Swiss-Prot record:
Its main location: cytoplasm. This is Protein RecA. It is found in: Cytoplasm. The lineage of its organism: Bacteria, Bacillati, Mycoplasmatota, Mycoplasmoidales, Mycoplasmoidaceae. The keyword DNA damage applies. Disulfide bonds: none annotated.
Amino acid sequence: MAQKEIINKKNTQKNSSFIESNNLTSFDFFDAKKNSEIETISTGSLNLDEALGSGGLPLGRIVELYGNESSGKTTIALNAVASFQKAGKTACYIDAEGALDLAYAKSIGIDLNKLLIAHPRHGENAFALIESLIKTNKISLIVIDSVAALIPKQELEGTIEEQTIGLHARMMSKGLRRIQSILPDSKTCVLFINQLREKPGVMFGNNEVTTGGKALRFYSSLRMEAKRVELLKDKFNNYVGIKTKVMVSKNKIAKPFGVAILEIMFNRGFVHEHEVIDLALKFNVVVRAGNSYSFNNESIAVGKEKLLNVLSEKPALFEQIKELTVQQLANKNSFQQTAS
């Protein structure tokens, strides 16, 4: 047995004796050994997994994904749902906006027969549902789309003339406190999609702020900002997608401030082939010499477009490169988590 394991075992026995001898067994104490490793599930994007530094979204934590309209937030969330399903997990999509495109979700790879979809009547109803889902210990991902659409019950039942300043923020604060109290003992990731608003009267600096007050940014272990940086066109000059930059503005799991560039096509979501090639080149799984690309010391293509064509024609080769790239990414993320 390693020296570190012996020390951990002695500390565990010492802590247990202290708790029992002082009649503290009725209280919940943090099990450091049990919670030392945080389980993560891929976001469905290798580039984003690398930027997060943890390999994906953490279970037992709150995550906020925010940005302006048409920046790819919903697509990122839907790809996460598809990834969780591929890992054998169950997901729930709380569609507070009532704007979920089921056909698009299916094109991304989501099994609609296995996806729970909810339309809460008001914000308090949504938080009650989230709390109940967490307690079942059967739901691994809960997506709330979006914070801005979580209308407080008091506002919904009142008249439109009534002043409700601060009501939304108070509801968010209370709801988040309740779910945070039970979330660490669960295997559920709660992902909130949020929007940016302009702060009136700000002349200098950043004049944008997320909706719902400050509670969500406080309780979130991860915060990701999505920003559209380019519109993608095909050879006929038609718009076919967007390029989005995602910055990890807060990270309590690994190193913060990672950046991922994502290509999102309107008809199918992420362009996984480009992500695999970019990371394969970064990790030297595929080696570039001038304009030539080689794998396992064998030349496979000349030019990047030719490389894409070869990999699309040879799916077995693509899967082999992808598998090795994912292994390299997992090793890197494991090192970053240990270092952090």
